[in-house]
Amino acid sequence: MSFLFRRSIEQPRVNEKETNKEVKDEPQHQQQEKEDDNSKQEELLSDSVNEKPKEQPKPVKRRGTFFGNLLGNGSKNSSSASLNSSHSSVSSSSKFPPLGPLTLTGYKESTHHRLLDSELANNIRNLIPARFQLFDNWELVYSLEQHGISLNTLYRNSNPEHQLRLLKKQKAAEKGFADSIVKNMVVGDTSRPRYSFEPKRSQSYVLVIKDNHNNKFGAYLSENLKPMEHRRYYGNGECFLWKCEKYDPSKLDHAVDKRATQEIRFKAFMYTGINDNIIYSNHDFIAIGSSNGQNGLFIDKSLLSGVSYSCDTFGNEILNSSPQNAKFGSFKIKGLEVWRIGTLE
């Protein structure tokens, strides 16, 4: 019984000879196909193992355009270039040296009423264009006390050609008579009125007025005052009006000294761009700023009186002291000066 049971659970053994015979009986082309498939799979596996990671393509460098190179962008991104330029401009502006001390020349020793001092001049200097801030010497060209009360004299002294003519005469006098004779023999006498002196550099001017109540006010002018034959305004947006205002510091919350009774502060009124009525002058008056027939600063031909209105050109307040809610302020001129900023040659 045990023998029969063992025979029943055993699996039938496959005859090795028969299997080998069956394999041999398969067609040869099928065996060849299997071998080819196996070899291809081995090659794919070996390639996948030995395959190196693909390198990412390098970005293509674009050549900058001609206008881009002029602007300094080159092949860089415009946004990054603008950021770099802005940072460089900020850093360069912060590296500017401080302005040198200001020198005021032209006062005579006998002049008693000097309207412009260093504090007021520096307040004006901080607001003028940077190219004129570099000049540390301001020259007095007209003074009511030194040159007399005359509008024509004011126009003549403010003319840069007249100033240059005086400068050349002064230099010739300093060099001596013999040197001037030799120069006239070589190049001719250039001091005669028929020669026209063209200034090589531009200048700007500061007008300072002091009235009978000791108020100081005036204007910064981009051009010299001159008589205009036709009603035509001149000057540019660099001009502005200014005044020195008296106030009571004890009424301020942040006042340092509550016992102080009166102080003076500088106020400027810049060009608004609403209109171009900046400067107009003729043989009858000088007007700076105008709207609706009212001038920010008006001086009559006598140089003894004037009036100030609030005008749209500068958006200014009344320059001289006036009652509250007044529409204009009239004044009597006690002193008047014109200063030149910039060199003549």
Curated annotation (Swiss-Prot):
GO terms for biological process: response to oxidative stress. May be involved in protection from oxidative damage. Belongs to the OXR1 family. SMART domains: TLDc. This is Oxidation resistance protein 1. InterPro entries: TLDc_dom. GO terms for cellular component: mitochondrion; nucleus. It comes from Candida albicans (strain SC5314 / ATCC MYA-2876) (Yeast). Residues 1-98 are annotated as: Disordered. Residues 7-58 have a biased composition (Basic and acidic residues). The keyword Oxidoreductase does not apply. Keywords: Mitochondrion. Pfam families: TLD (PF07534). Its main location: mitochondrion. Residues 68-94 have a biased composition (Low complexity). It is found in: Mitochondrion. The lineage of its organism: Eukaryota, Fungi, Dikarya, Ascomycota, Saccharomycotina. Residues 114-342 form the TLDc domain.
